Regions:
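Extended, aromatic/histidine-rich regions of cofactor-dependent oxidoreductases associated
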Residues: 165-200
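Start-of-domain marker
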Residues: 18-77
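Terminal leader/tail segments of proteins
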Residues: 63-65, 79-84, 152, 200
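Bacterial Sec-dependent N-terminal signal peptides
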Residues: 1-24
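Short beta-strand segments
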Residues: 105-109, 145, 157, 186-188
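A mature extracytoplasmic/lumenal domain signature
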Residues: 71, 111-113, 133-135, 161-165, ...
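Mid-length scaffold segments of soluble, non-membrane domains
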Residues: 78-142
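Acidic, glycine-rich flexible loop segments
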Residues: 128-165
Length: 200
């Protein structure tokens, strides 16, 4: 087993740092994701699920879930071992707190750096955002979802919940995935991003 914290970055073709946010057409975005899942050499799906795989189920794109968040950095925070779904921890550091609004409601999430990629070319601006919301266990995976973020501005950061994705252990329990901290629960329904996967 191995820790899978950033592998989905490559899934979404953002292995290299983007100079600006690229608002892909949702159809193109879904094709990119689904093509990755269909590729047996990299797919997180089990063979029996891959055999019958037609595509992931997504919420329809909704611009209400594309938000700019104010970021309060925590440079004094120390590295720690984040619990995962296995006994292999993820080595991370709290990068800061994000403050934003969705439909006039105020929310806060903690965002992290993955220290295993510290100094690795292409990941200089990468941040890891795990979150929970009221759709978990129903329309979406019970363990929550992740979003890949890129920080270029000291004051704000773009969060596109339409790009929320499942941990790889949602498809195969042999993967080791960071467990979403309870403090990153959003007391609302985030009807954006990928939905739950129904295994064969």
């Amino acid at each position: 087993m191995r820790i899978v914290l950033l592998s989905i970055i490559c899934l979404f073709f953002t292995c290299r740092v983007e100079k600006r946010y690229e608002n892909l057409n949702l159809t193109d975005y879904q094709k990119q994701v689904n093509n990755y899942f269909k590729d047996a050499s990299v797919s997180p799906l089990k063979p029996r699920d891959l055999k019958n795989f037609k595509g992931l189920d997504f919420f329809e794109f909704d611009s209400l879930y594309v938000v700019y968040a104010k970021i309060q950095e925590t440079p004094e925070s120390l590295p720690f071992k984040m619990k995962t779904t296995t006994d292999i921890p993820a080595h991370v550091r709290k990068y800061g707190d994000l403050f934003f609004q969705i439909i006039d409601k105020e929310f806060e999430l903690t965002v992290y750096e993955n220290l295993e990629y510290d100094g690795v070319e292409g990941y200089e601006n990468y941040l890891f955002l795990p979150f929970l919301d009221q759709t978990n266990g129903n329309e979406t995976y019970g363990g929550g979802r992740y979003i890949d973020l890129y920080q270029y501005d000291n004051d704000s950061i773009l969060i596109d919940f339409n790009r929320a994705y499942n941990p790889q252990c949602a498809y195969d329990e042999n993967f080791s995935c960071p467990i979403v901290p309870r403090k990153n629960f959003l007391n609302t329904r985030i009807e954006a991003g990928v939905k739950n996967f129904i295994k064969n």
